[in-house]
Amino acid sequence: NRQLTEKGLKVEKASAAVVDATIIQTAGSKQRQAIEVDEEGQVSGQTTPSKDSDARWIKKNGLYKLGYKQHTRTDAEGYIEKLHITPANAHECKHLSPLLEGIAEGTTVYADKGYDSAENRQHLKEHQLLDGIMRKACRNRPLTEAQTKRNRYLSKTRYVVEQSFGTLHRKFRYARAAYFGLIKVSAQSHLKAMCLNLLKAANRLSA
């Protein structure tokens, strides 16, 4: 990223940080016998044993997936600036602060409702970062009209990180890892992020 900045292909100090997470399925064949997943990300019931002891199960869009979660921060243009990998059952709400290391004071942090917590908002305040986290409705406490409008506005900015995930999954075929183990999957994620950033820079040059 430093070299892209020096070449004028990426802004040096972005005014926005966009945070989200995506699932990277474990390497190998699909497992189809999963029925229930407990709070620890383990399957309740009989399944084919996994070769990847670091991977965990998660239910996403009605489907059970075994793998990892890539927690990611991009700038406003979709360049990946920071990421880290956890088992898939890790909740993104607890993994916001590591993604914000090194960003400048006054930066607006955009994130979806999965990051809505008092702790995360306090972290932004303590580090003089602007709050762009979408609000989550609670039981017996629906969102106000103003909060709903704010969420709609914030979602228009968050699309850049979703576009980056789409490119990783389609262009770089990274919906599934090529290796077993958290360390190797983390290394692969960082290499894919470098490829994504170089592709975005190349597209900018040819535009």
Give the positions of each predicted feature.
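Short hydrophobic/aromatic-enriched beta-strand-loop microsegments
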Residues: 127-135
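Short, acidic/turn-prone active-site loops that include or flank metal/cofactor-
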Residues: 85-87, 135-139
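Feature captures the catalytic cores and cofactor-binding loops of soluble hydro-lyases/lyases
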Residues: 124, 142, 162
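Residue-level "edge-of-site" marker
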Residues: 17, 137, 182
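Basic, amphipathic alpha-helical segments enriched in Lys/Arg and hydrophobic/aromatic residues
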Residues: 127-128, 147-207
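Short secondary-structure boundary segments
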Residues: 112-113, 135-136, 163
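Polybasic low-complexity intrinsically disordered regions
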Residues: 1-127, 195
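Short, charged, surface-exposed secondary-structure boundary motifs
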Residues: 94, 119, 139-147
